[in-house]
């Protein structure tokens, strides 16, 4: 999506060899208009997939997932990283490693929210090593739900997450794909949604 690539160029900041800071529009401050366009794009790509639920992981995946769910007219559920006192029923639980935070979190979703046979679209903010996405896929497998696709706002294609998901037979759509960082600049690979631009 050219709109997202332009925003990454103008407001993204490359940190070191493998980190992109996008806190001006996605990971801290949220540009709701951009997120709405991204959500609409995911809905276009998966319009024929009969999605019944959109699932993400807190926190930065929530905005694009919510707008995708709105466009698809289905509920959005986010996996929580911390259990609270109201989550006292059966839980779907898995471990997820965060590349950026360098820590492993236990994530959970109430089993009452995902039904056997649900057709789930998983949305997340970044795809790096694929651990968050694979963790969400594992939660959906526990619920006997079908993952019909994965939508990533930004993919770091120079890391192995994409290949891990494709090796699992997943349909993957990344709105912006980063081929590499060069001299502090982002070099893009062709995005998966290019037919919609």
From Swiss-Prot:
Primary subcellular site in the record, as a coarse category: cytoplasm
Gene Ontology CC terms: cytoplasm
Repressor keyword on record: no
GO terms for biological process, alphabetical: purine ribonucleoside salvage; xanthine metabolic process; XMP salvage
Keyword set includes Endoplasmic reticulum: no
EC code: 2.4.2.22
Pathway annotation from the record: Purine metabolism; XMP biosynthesis via salvage pathway; XMP from xanthine: step 1/1
Residues given in the record as 5-phospho-alpha-D-ribose 1-diphosphate binding sites: 128-132
Protein keywords: Cytoplasm, Glycosyltransferase, Purine salvage, Transferase
One MF annotation (Gene Ontology) recorded for this entry: xanthine phosphoribosyltransferase activity
Domain of life: Bacteria
Sites where the protein binds xanthine: 20, 27, 156
Localization per Swiss-Prot or TrEMBL: Cytoplasm
NCBIfam families per UniProt: PRK09219.1, XPRTase
Family the UniProt entry places it in: Belongs to the purine/pyrimidine phosphoribosyltransferase family. Xpt subfamily.
Self-association and partners: Homodimer.
Protein name as catalogued: Xanthine phosphoribosyltransferase
Organism in which the protein naturally occurs: Lactococcus lactis subsp. cremoris (strain SK11)
